[in-house]
């Protein structure tokens, strides 16, 4: 189960216990429990509507009505505002990417506030995403889907956050771009970033994740390490249809 999958070398940085969340009167999360350790890539897997994105938004403080416990580096952030959570070193890259269409690539990169020391410089961003340097003066609407995703990830790397939450970063992208995103995540992990990933593309997730949690109907129903993947393929087929 999920508790057994949590044994890794890094210290715990995020602990979520009995997380409940609502959109208006709609009760979406029904007691989510999971943790993330330093330097890991942890993936939340599940079908559409399972509650994965709501979980990320709750951690980020975007969902107004939420209860339970969310602790980051030992600090209780359950009821903190999004700006205070960002200053703790957490960044969220939404599925819709949020690129400002009227701004060019440079302006999009310079817009986010630096919330902590250690944010990537433009030169470091261009080393990670060479395409963005080539499109520096292009408007957001002129970028391909893959370039928009690169820009969305690059923007949160500018903030100084070391805990990244990526929501469906491969959605709608060509296989060659998905591979590039995978290489980027692996490189960020090697540089000490901790990543919480939401994915439906299990085959992609299996190339980058250290651990998995399965989310269904607003609850974590299972969890295992990447080393246990082959032993859990039947379960994954049942849960996800992969």
Regions found by a protein language model. Name each.
Residues 2-242:
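Glycine-rich phosphate-binding loops of nucleotide-dependent enzymes
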């Amino acid at each position: 189960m999920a508790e057994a999958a949590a044994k890794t070398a890094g210290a715990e940085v995020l602990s979520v216990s009995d997380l409940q969340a609502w959109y208006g009167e709609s009760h979406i999360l029904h007691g989510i429990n999971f943790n993330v350790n330093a330097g890991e890539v942890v993936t939340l897997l599940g079908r559409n509507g399972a509650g994965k994105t709501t979980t990320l938004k709750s951690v980020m403080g975007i969902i107004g009505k939420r209860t339970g416990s969310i602790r980051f580096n030992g600090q209780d952030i359950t009821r903190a505002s999004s700006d205070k959570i960002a200053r703790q070193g957490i960044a969220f890259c939404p599925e819709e990417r949020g690129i400002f269409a009227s701004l060019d690539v440079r302006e999009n990169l310079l817009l986010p506030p630096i919330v902590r020391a250690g944010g990537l410089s433009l030169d470091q961003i261009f080393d990670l995403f060479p395409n963005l340097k080539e499109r520096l003066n292009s408007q957001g609407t002129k970028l391909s889907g893959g370039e928009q995703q690169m820009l969305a990830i690059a923007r949160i790397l500018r903030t100084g956050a070391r805990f990244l939450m990526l929501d469906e970063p491969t959605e709608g992208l060509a296989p060659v771009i998905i591979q590039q995103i995978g290489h980027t995540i692996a490189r960020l992990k090697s540089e000490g970033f901790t990543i919480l990933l939401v994915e439906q593309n299990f085959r992609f997730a299996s190339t980058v994740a250290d651990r998995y949690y399965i989310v269904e109907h607003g609850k974590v129903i299972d969890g295992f390490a990447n080393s246990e993947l082959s032993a859990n393929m039947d379960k994954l087929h049942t849960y996800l249809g992969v």
